[in-house]
Amino acid sequence: MKRIGVLTSGGDSPGMNAAIRAVVRKAIYHGLEVYGIYHGYAGLIAGQIKKLEIGDVGDIIHRGGTMLYTARCPEFKTLEGQLKGIEQLKKHGIEGLVVIGGDGSYQGAKKLTEHGYPCVGVPGTIDNDIPGTDFTIGFDTALNTVIDAIDKIRDTATSHERTYVIEVMGRHAGDIALWAGLAGGAESILIPEADYDMDEIVSRLKRGHERGKKHSIIIVAEGVGSGVDFGKRIEEATGLETRVTVLGHVQRGGSPTAFDRVLASRLGARAVELLIEGKGGRCVGIQNNQLVDHDIIEALAQTHTVDQKMYQLSKELSI
């Protein structure tokens, strides 16, 4: 293999640039040419492809977002779109592809794999919901962003003696809510993977209020429902003054943490190694701090599961 490509797809996550940097530098170190594909699969179909040199990835390891930009691409879900993408890869002489992104990005890599095109997936999403890895690129940074917000909101919640509902990202996975809620000392955490008992939450808030606790923090993953609606229900049920903060896309931005920079560098470099070894159709990850790789089709057949013991711990500590 002499020439590979790299793209980022779907929602961006802090650390993607560090992964791109690792792919480019690792490939050049081994004598390969690297081509950046801009705007994800949409850019692949459109032929937005440019050769990358070492200088192109200088001064990006600390930057959030992705220098290759990203986009959603419904067209790539069709056979026609996939064949257009493969045509562009062949036109540019690209023999293997590194795809950095989440579940949708992996689905695209899976399709290319099924067409016989060598791809390696690198998990880049703040949701931490990709099977086959303990952590995804961007999760740690997003987690720290949320914890910082919780700490600051708790200051004002204490001053005004209010209950605050904080809505965080996570349509299908509650890792951000769970980890941030546990680290931030939240009184209640609501995640998509677990049913919640409104009466229990209300009782917990009232018990705390009765023993002199004048403020509370509730973390709600967006997949559970609207934080605004939940805040109204809490205020009506408890009579406690309640405010709602929806953190939104601030969770996707910012300079990646050291953990995400190192993780992205390790995973990006390993993806290149797999292509050099002729092992396409794989996805990389980290488990017990060891690099691993899995068949991408088998990985997509699995379902991410939340840590139920951690969820139970969060409930026990919020009495």
From Swiss-Prot:
Locations listed in the record: Cytoplasm
EC number of the protein: 2.7.1.11
Pathway assignment: Carbohydrate degradation; glycolysis; D-glyceraldehyde 3-phosphate and glycerone phosphate from D-glucose: step 3/4
Keywords from the named record: Allosteric enzyme, ATP-binding, Cytoplasm, Glycolysis, Kinase, Magnesium, Metal-binding, Nucleotide-binding, Transferase
Listed cofactors: Mg(2+)
Family: Belongs to the phosphofructokinase type A (PFKA) family. ATP-dependent PFK group I subfamily. Prokaryotic clade 'B1' sub-subfamily.
Function: Catalyzes the phosphorylation of D-fructose 6-phosphate to fructose 1,6-bisphosphate by ATP, the first committing step of glycolysis.
Protein name as it appears in the record: ATP-dependent 6-phosphofructokinase
Organism: Anoxybacillus flavithermus (strain DSM 21510 / WK1)
Gene: pfkA
